[in-house]
Amino acid sequence: MPDNIRKAVGLILLVSLLSVGLCKPLKEYLLIPTQMRVFETQTQAIETSLSVNAQTSESSEAFTVKKDPHEIKVTGKKSGESELVYDLAGFPIKKTKVHVLPDLKVIPGGQSIGVKLHSVGVLVVGFHQINTSEGKKSPGETAGIEAGDIIIEMNGQKIEKMNDVAPFIQKAGKTGESLDLLIKRDKQKIKTKLIPEKDEGEGKYRIGLYIRDSAAGIGTMTFYEPKTKKYGALGHVISDMDTKKPIVVENGEIVKSTVTSIEKGTGGNPGEKLARFSSERKTIGDINRNSPFGIFGTLHQPIQNNISDQALPVAFSTEVKKGPAEILTVIDDDKVEKFDIEIVSTTPQKFPATKGMVLKITDPRLLKETGGIVQGMSGSPIIQNGKVIGAVTHVFVNDPTSGYGVHIEWMLSEAGIDIYGKEKAS
């Protein structure tokens, strides 16, 4: 074998052996974050077994550092930012930019709530054929209106509820004039015209559309921020039962509800909380937002769950770990209880996303009573290591013991609680 080839092979073998020996340290080095966020008075740990020193890059008042054998603990002291510098044998090897944010705590929920939503305008949920003198017709369908469209104006007048519609239809029908409609379809606004037809059976004019201006259901309160009274619930969007499209909210309200029974979930057939609430019940908060991360608004007064009424810290998605956790929810009457779960997997997210973790119900009593995650449990707060980390959102249809959760970070943002305010301003 030529000498130059022998040297090349030897070099390759040497590099390979070194790579194997350095594999774990290299992985741990790469796992050290380049940026991290921590709240004032709270501590975050960076897991590493590397023999490195860690210290602030300057006489910083933003945070303190403590090195343990297998982790580096960073504790926020004062909002601001600084750098954490790692050195090996006196040589700097990496830096982490640390953002210390103003302290934030929320009161976890768990209460069963009744939800009443009022849409912007009236929602078209379907069509029907009118028996006219010329046969069956649907003027709305002929005009190009689609299920899921929202009628927001008729003849230039704002439409807010179903009762607003009938006078315009009857007037246009009697005069034989067309109705000028302004409809909202997704993000578009579309103008169209239609002429009401007389129903031969009833003698009234119709437009051949099924419409709705409100929706109701139940869910679970996730949290509220005690200073602003802003809250978040459900953890997922509310969609219309017929069109399956998200309801565009004009306003709405939440009330207390009572769980009367549970339909237990089985494989392929998710269960459900059966609950009741009366329209006469006192409104406990308003709804001003219906988003992929839940419903949001402001409470009219503080509400208690009588199990964890003290404000708790919140966790960033990077802090959530695989392992034991708890949820707060109601399975009987209005009593909030704590149940054991397991975080099976979690995804540290840089941008808002609805499915941030997979969880599994492990509590024997909850499994016995419900079979796992059931409809109406959406929004149940998840607590891990004394912090609110997220909310239950979806159940796996073929395995009701498991489902998805959303990180609390994104629900707080949707609620209008700017946890990054000082960070953005710096």
Curated annotation (Swiss-Prot):
As given in the record, the signal peptide range reads: 1-28
- GO BP annotations, alphabetical order: proteolysis; sporulation resulting in formation of a cellular spore
Instruction: Return the protein name.
Output: SpoIVB peptidase
Where in this chain does the record put each Peptidase S55 domain? Answer: 188-426
The parts of the chain that form a coiled coil are none
- According to the UniProt record, what class of enzyme is this? hydrolase
Outcome reported for the amino acid change (mutating residue 378 to A/K): Inhibits autoproteolysis of protein and spore formation
NCBIfam families, per the entry: spore_IV_B
The segment annotated PDZ binding runs over 393-395
Record field: catalytic activity: Self-cleaves 52-Val-|-Asn-53, 62-Ala-|-Phe-63 and 74-Val-|-Thr-75 at the N-terminus of SpoIVB
Identify one Pfam family in the record.
Answer: PDZ_6
Q: Tell me where it resides.
A: Forespore intermembrane space
UniProt keyword list: Hydrolase, Protease, Serine protease, Signal, Sporulation, Zymogen
Q: Look up keyword Signal and say if it applies.
A: yes
Under Enzyme Commission nomenclature, its number is 3.4.21.116
Outcome recorded upon mutating residue 394 to D: Sporulation deficient spores
Keyword Hydrolase among UniProt keywords: yes
Q: Which PROSITE patterns match?
A: PDZ, SPOIVB
Query: Where in this chain does the record put each PDZ domain?
Result: 101-187
Q: Where is the active site?
A: 236 (charge relay system), 363 (charge relay system), 378 (charge relay system)
**Described purpose of this protein according to its UniProt entry:** Plays a central role in the sigma-K checkpoint which coordinates gene expression during the later stages of spore formation. The protease is activated by trans cleavage of the zymogen precursor producing SpoIVB-45 kDa. This undergoes further trimming by cis cleavage to form SpoIVB-43 kDa and SpoIVB-42 kDa. The protease then cleaves the C-terminus of the SpoIVFA metalloprotease activating the latter.
How is it regulated at the activity level? Answer: The zymogen is inhibited from undergoing autoactivation by BofC. The protease is inactivated by proteolytic cleavage.
